[in-house]
A protein has these predicted regions:
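C-terminal motif of bacterial Sec signal peptides marking the signal peptidase cleavage site
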Residues: 14-17
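Extended amphipathic alpha-helical segments
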Residues: 23-25, 72, 76-87, 93, ...
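Long, amphipathic coiled-coil "stalk"/hairpin helices in large membrane-associated assemblies
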Residues: 23-87, 118, 124, 188-191, ...
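Surface-exposed connector loops and short turns at secondary-structure junctions
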Residues: 217-243, 270-294
Length: 296
C-alpha cells in the first residue's frame, strides 16, 4: 500500500512539472535603461539632492558644483569686452572734418571754374583747387582704410572674447547637475562637500516606468517571434505569485549565446539561445532583477 502511494505521488509531481513547463515559452529577468550621471565640472560639491528611491522628471536640478571662480572669470571677460568696445572708433565723427574740408574745397573749385568761364580767374587757380581736392580725397581714403582696419581688428578681439564668455557660460551650466531622464535614483555615489572632478560618477538613475524583460529563446522559437509582436509577460513575485502584463518585443539578438545558468528554456537540450527584449509598462510593482516569464 505504501509503495502505491509513493508511485501516485511521483506521478502527480511529474504531471505537475510537465504542466507547469507548458505555462510559459521563455524566462528572463527585468531590467531598465540605467544612466550613470557623472560630473562635467571640477570643484566642491555644494549639494546633491538625489537620494536612492527619489523620482525626478527630466531636467530637474539636483546638485550644484562651486561656480565662484568661473563667475569671476566671466566678469573679467565681460570687462575686457567692454574695454574693446570702448576702443571702437566712431568712423562718421572722425572723418567729418575731412569731409567738410572736401565740401568747402569743392565749392571753391566750382566758384573758380565759373569765374574762369567769365574770364575773371586764371587756369592756375582752378588747377590749384583740383590739386587740393585730390589731396583731401586721398586723405579721406587713408582715414577710412585705417579706421576700417582698426574696426576689423577690434571686431576680431571682441569675437574672441565673446567665444571665451560662451565657453565659461557652458562651464557654469555644467556646474548645475540635472537628471537626464524621467526616472528613479538607484544609487548615489557622492556627498555634499566632496570634491567633484570631471567624469566622477555622482548617481545612477533608471526609467522604472518603461522597463524590459530580457528573455531567451531557442532557435526553434524564433520562427514564431517578430519585432512588434505583443506577448503576455508574467512577473514572478515568488511563492507562485504571478502577475501578468502586456509586453511588446522591441529587440531580437542577431547572434546566439550560451544559455545563462539561471534561465530555463522549453528545450532543456538547447545550449545556445537568442536574447530578446520585451517592453513592459511598469505599474510600480516590478523591480529590477526580478524573474519573469513569457507566453507567446
Amino acid at each position: 500500500m505504501k509503495k502505491r502511494y509513493v508511485f501516485q505521488a511521483l506521478l502527480l509531481l511529474c504531471l505537475t512539472a510537465c504542466g507547469s513547463k507548458d505555462e510559459f515559452d521563455a524566462t528572463g529577468t527585468f531590467e531598465a535603461t540605467e544612466i550613470v550621471v557623472s560630473s562635467e565640472a571640477t570643484g566642491k560639491l555644494f549639494y546633491l539632492n538625489a537620494e536612492e528611491g527619489m523620482h525626478f522628471t527630466q531636467g530637474t536640478e539636483v546638485g550644484l558644483i562651486d561656480t565662484v571662480q568661473l563667475y569671476l572669470k566671466k566678469r573679467q571677460l565681460e570687462a575686457q569686452m567692454k574695454s574693446v568696445e570702448n576702443q571702437r572708433p566712431d568712423i562718421h565723427r572722425q572723418i567729418a572734418a575731412t569731409k567738410a574740408q572736401i565740401a568747402t574745397a569743392q565749392r571753391e573749385r566750382d566758384r573758380v571754374e565759373n569765374l574762369l568761364k567769365a574770364q575773371a580767374a586764371n587756369r592756375k587757380q582752378l588747377d590749384d583747387w583740383d590739386s587740393q581736392l585730390a589731396i583731401l580725397n586721398r586723405q579721406l581714403e587713408a582715414q577710412l582704410s585705417s579706421l576700417g582696419n582698426t574696426t576689423a581688428s577690434l571686431t576680431e578681439q571682441s569675437s574672441s572674447v565673446a567665444i571665451q564668455v560662451a565657453q565659461v557660460e557652458d562651464q557654469l551650466k555644467k556646474c548645475h547637475i540635472t537628471v537626464p531622464i524621467n526616472g528613479t535614483i538607484l544609487a548615489k555615489y557622492a556627498e555634499p562637500s566632496e570634491l567633484a572632478t570631471v567624469g566622477k560618477p555622482l548617481f545612477k538613475i533608471a526609467d522604472m516606468e518603461h522597463i524590459f524583460l530580457r528573455a531567451y529563446l531557442t532557435s526553434s522559437q524564433l520562427e514564431s517571434v517578430k519585432l512588434g509582436n505583443e506577448v503576455t509577460v508574467f512577473a514572478d513575485f515568488g511563492n507562485a505569485q504571478l502577475t501578468n502584463y502586456t509586453g511588446k518585443i522591441v529587440w531580437i539578438s542577431e547572434e546566439a549565446e550560451f544559455t545563462p545558468k539561471t534561465i530555463l528554456t522549453n528545450d532543456e537540450r538547447a545550449n545556445q539561445v537568442y536574447a530578446v527584449k520585451i517592453a513592459v509598462e511598469n505599474d510600480g510593482h516590478i523591480k529590477l532583477g526580478m524573474y519573469g516569464k513569457v507566453k507567446f
